[in-house]
């Protein structure tokens, strides 16, 4: 495998998530407190939840429209991305306390190249992917994109390319990571509003949630073509891989459910309905793999589901517009960004 120079070795060619097994925390994070960080996009605040008690232990104010809480590549920092304030606010995950705030143009979402060299800012309204030095966060290259609403990314198994979703033009972009250039665009069918994107464990396919088409596209990334489409539910939005790499959890924001896709067969294995409905958006899986945490975007709550059968463990009242919550720490050697893509 011809890896992107400088990226960590692939532990298992058949499972890119091999380092993400239950409770296999990196030495870097093993002593960090287990917390859940919730950006309240309409309250301009971050709520911090103790997952043992399901209680909020702290809330602090940030700038306008905090969208996602993002672990850094080296696992040592969390960034709160506030696109309408043009800033990132640091959280120290060793203490759960907020730190400095820095000016960053339009940070709707934040990712990291697999070699840890660059952060990639999804500057959605500016129609750019901004490559910044991962240590200093200084701009290295601003890459204009030929689409609208670029906001979610995942990387190929070898780190050589990324796929990015363009929510408002219904497209995917393929970007050469080393050369930082767009090398392809793909119009999705059925059309709609693509959201989260996630690589299959074997590295051969990408799954792309489509909120308007109510399901998930299966994409051959190497050949950059659509393979199939899996209907999951109204408003398919967030994508999370189970700790055993067997299932993909798909949050269906428009109907208050979570669909499980078997990652070997691509068949639907189950659908979990949130009692009373809801608006499950983004989130993450607990370190032990036993809980799925999701923000209730239009209900000012956070849902906690038991991954053994999908029953609701807790519904926690938070601020308005909770969005890209981060369960932290999680297993993995390094972070590719978003609310936690670990390999």
Regions of interest found by a model, annotated:
Residues 1-343:
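Predominantly soluble domains enriched in secretory-pathway, periplasmic, or organellar proteins
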